[in-house]
Amino acid sequence: IIQRSRFLAKAAPAASEEEALAFLAAHREPQATHNAYAYRIGPLYRFSDDGEPRAPGRPILHAIEAAGLDRVVVLVVRYFGGVKLGAGGLVRAYGGVAAEALRRAPKAPLLDWVEVAFRVPFPEVGRVHGLLRARHLEAEEAYLPEGVRFALRLPPGGEGGPCLKALSDLTRGRLWVEG
């Protein structure tokens, strides 16, 4: 509570703009006076002041940048308490609440997954499905005249090579890696 106004900050990871917008839609508080937010996903960033004068969205974005975070969305909700805070007070309130929420939030390292695409003839599809199930991997499939194209994301750390080797062995070399 700052000068009788109540501020609540909510933060979450967001791997895409769609995830950020879904989080904002789910956590926005319609009864609040303002729902200001900011998010950063790689080079993409956005912020909104939600009608609050003196641009509180930018201090929220600054809190994200000062914390050195990426792929994150922060929503700050204000319930007006009757006292106007002025330009500096709004910047400190929104930015400070956002910074505190980010400081307290659990953090995880960002991992860039390896994308792999390969094709196999139809007789090998069942074997490929079995290996992917055994390794708890999901793949997008596209059916082509000569077989099936699989596109999957593998965790970083060298998993791609062993997985492709196992698939190649399983299909007796009848696997064509794209790219």
UniProtKB/Swiss-Prot annotation:
One of its GO terms (cellular component) is cytoplasm. PROSITE patterns: UPF0029. Belongs to the IMPACT family. SUPFAM superfamilies: EF-G C-terminal domain-like, Ribosomal protein S5 domain 2-like. Signal peptide: none annotated. InterPro entries: EFG_III/V, Impact, Impact_N, Impact_N_sf, Ribosomal_Su5_D2-typ_SF, UPF0029_Impact_CS. This is IMPACT family member in pol 5'region. One of its GO terms (biological process) is regulation of translational initiation. It comes from Thermus thermophilus. It comes from the Bacteria.
